[in-house]
Regions:
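Alpha-helical scaffold segments that mediate packing/assembly in large oligomeric complexes
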Residues: 2-74, 181-182
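Structural beta-strand/beta-sheet cores of well-ordered domains, especially the beta-sheet scaffolds
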Residues: 2-4, 73-76, 113-115, 156-158
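Helix N-cap / beta->alpha transition motif
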Residues: 9, 80-84, 132, 172
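Short loop/turn segments at secondary-structure transitions that flank enzyme active sites
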Residues: 12, 38, 84-86, 166-168
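Short helix/loop capping segments that flank catalytic or ligand/cofactor-binding pockets
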Residues: 16-17, 87-89, 169-171
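Charged, low-complexity, helix-prone segments enriched in Lys/Glu/Asp/Gln
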Residues: 32-40, 84, 134-138
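Extended, solvent-exposed, turn-rich assembly/linker loops in the middle of proteins
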Residues: 44-114, 120
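Sequence/fold signature of self-assembling virion shell proteins
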Residues: 93-182
Length: 182
């Protein structure tokens, strides 16, 4: 269960502009989604006992080996720390002139072997988790996002809680591969 609570005085709610409330709710949604991403990562990392280990640093050859480890699945997504993302994007194989133009024009980053890079500060350094997002993980959700409002008259406050109940269950262990490096 993930959620956030918004507490404001009655006057602040009454006189606020709708845009501010919308922005706040959107940010609360982002916080819930970030928590669910970390829950999904924990479920995926628990499935995989071993993987590819590189003795040296991260190399393009190591990424190719990771891609090649998928038997009957496609590597569609890489869950990577910020430091490892920078290492990947600095590889000479990623510094294509046409790809650079695409990045400047659209903001889309060139990704290794067509996989989407998802970076997060909480993902561990020196570990890359690769997955086939179509069959690696199931999200089990209990209902929709729940929003509850409460008025505390004695304190003249209004509270709003936004919660989502979800869990993650691995489907096929072969759809998840892990690469660790020094």
């Amino acid at each position: 269960k993930r959620g956030r609570m918004l507490v404001a005085s009655y006057e602040a709610v009454k006189f606020q502009k709708l845009d501010l409330f919308t922005v706040t709710l959107r940010q609360i949604g982002n916080c819930i989604a970030e928590g669910q991403l970390l829950d999904a990562y924990a479920a995926l990392i628990g499935v995989h006992d071993s993987g590819i280990t590189l003795e040296g640093g991260l190399t393009y050859a190591g990424l190719v080996d990771l891609w090649n480890a998928f038997e009957g699945f496609n590597m569609t997504t890489l869950l990577v720390s910020a430091r490892d993302t920078a290492s990947i994007l600095k590889m000479t194989e990623m510094q294509d002139a046409i790809a650079g133009n695409d990045f400047h024009a659209t903001g889309r980053v060139v990704t290794p072997l067509g996989a989407e890079l998802i970076k997060h500060k909480m993902f561990p350094d020196n570990t890359i988790l690769a997955l086939d997002r179509t069959c690696a993980l199931e999200k089990v959700q209990a209902g929709d996002v729940v929003t509850d409002f409460d008025k505390l008259i004695d304190r003249q406050l209004e509270r709003a809680s936004i919660t989502a109940i979800a869990g993650f269950s691995p489907i096929f262990s072969g759809a998840v591969q892990m690469l660790t490096h020094a």
